[in-house]
Amino acid sequence: SLSRAGDINKQVFLDHAERVAHIAYHLGRKLDWTEAELNELVLSALLHDVGILTSDEQLALADLEPVRERVSAHCLRGYRLVRSISLFSGLARNVLEHHDYYSPNLRPIPAVLHVADRVDIILKKDTYYLWQVEDILAYFTHRQGDVFSPEVVEALRRVAQTPSFWLDLQHRNYQYAAGRSSFRRKLT
């Protein structure tokens, strides 16, 4: 039924958001971010695609080289929505800028979100993640300084050397909280 299709679409969205939060959290840790910075990063990761309204928009974002016009609409809608909720309004710019290409003026959280989002899009979910690390790193290395922040790509290289990062990601054992509040979420 149509409502079941909507539920599946929501689950795909939630799974993507949690994987991006896991990836972003580990990148932020490699960048030596504070607990407060990591918390803002994780919340922004969980909300980054809240502006997506249709499955067509989801499919457009799955393109490895997304066209800026196709991604900017969901970023702007997400920005407006997040800004309208007082509890999350401070995260709105991160949602707006999470597909922005690298520039020296790009704020750090959107730069990390951009890399984390693309890592999740690139990963072939039906293939062992550890077998894909070399290709993923080549993709980002080729585009660092142009599309992606060199500092964040270097953090990705360091994270990628840890097999448990990829295993946790593949087996949905997400870790994305800082400090004493750290927890792991095992989804079944």
Q: What are the language-model segments listed below?
A:
Residues S1-T188:
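Histidine- and acidic-residue-rich, metal-dependent catalytic cores
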